[in-house]
Amino acid sequence: MRVGIGYDVHKLVENRKLILGGVEIQYSKGLLGHSDADVLVHAIIDSILGAAGLGDIGKLFPDSDNKYKGISSLKLLKEVNALIKDKGYKIGNIDSTIIAQKPKISPYIEDIKKSLCNVLDIDLGSINIKATTEEGLGFTGRGEGISSQSICLLI
């Protein structure tokens, strides 16, 4: 068994879609990034890569490479899942938290879980997604960005 943690943050800006866990969230702003800027998937990817000892998302999918510009983070997650399977690992479980003052994430949690389970080929009981605010504190509390944390157990 191996455990890895992941963290990601992106700035909220106008004229971008807000994608979390591969699901479009209805909101007036979206996250700025080289890819679709899906902070949840990026944190999950880093937790998986960390558990497998394979570096991090920036090493594997550098933002200096134009082939990743605008890419769906779910495609990156699928590639990471294939990498760990090739090394003989499978996901035991994933637990993640999305930190955002707005929008309200809880109505989307089940769709997010289904999206991630579909890509990772795991059952719904193997993933947990939570959402919280920072009670108006810090950059997420001021609505300037969204962050996410994740932990993954590989078996």
From Swiss-Prot:
Keywords: Isoprene biosynthesis, Lyase, Metal-binding. 4-CDP-2-C-methyl-D-erythritol 2-phosphate binds at residues 8-10, 34-35, 56-58, 61-65, 132-135, 139, 142. It holds the Pfam family YgbB. Belongs to the IspF family. GO terms for biological process: isopentenyl diphosphate biosynthetic process, methylerythritol 4-phosphate pathway; terpenoid biosynthetic process. The lineage of its organism: Bacteria, Bacillati, Bacillota, Clostridia, Eubacteriales. The keyword Lyase applies. The gene is ispF. The keyword tRNA-binding does not apply. Homotrimer. Pathway: Isoprenoid biosynthesis; isopentenyl diphosphate biosynthesis via DXP pathway; isopentenyl diphosphate from 1-deoxy-D-xylulose 5-phosphate: step 4/6. A divalent metal cation binds at D8, H10, H42. Its EC number is 4.6.1.12. Involved in the biosynthesis of isopentenyl diphosphate (IPP) and dimethylallyl diphosphate (DMAPP), two major building blocks of isoprenoid compounds. Catalyzes the conversion of 4-diphosphocytidyl-2-C-methyl-D-erythritol 2-phosphate (CDP-ME2P) to 2-C-methyl-D-erythritol 2,4-cyclodiphosphate (ME-CPP) with a corresponding release of cytidine 5-monophosphate (CMP). Binds 1 divalent metal cation per subunit. PANTHER family: 2-C-METHYL-D-ERYTHRITOL 2,4-CYCLODIPHOSPHATE SYNTHASE, CHLOROPLASTIC. This is 2-C-methyl-D-erythritol 2,4-cyclodiphosphate synthase. One of its GO terms (molecular function) is metal ion binding.
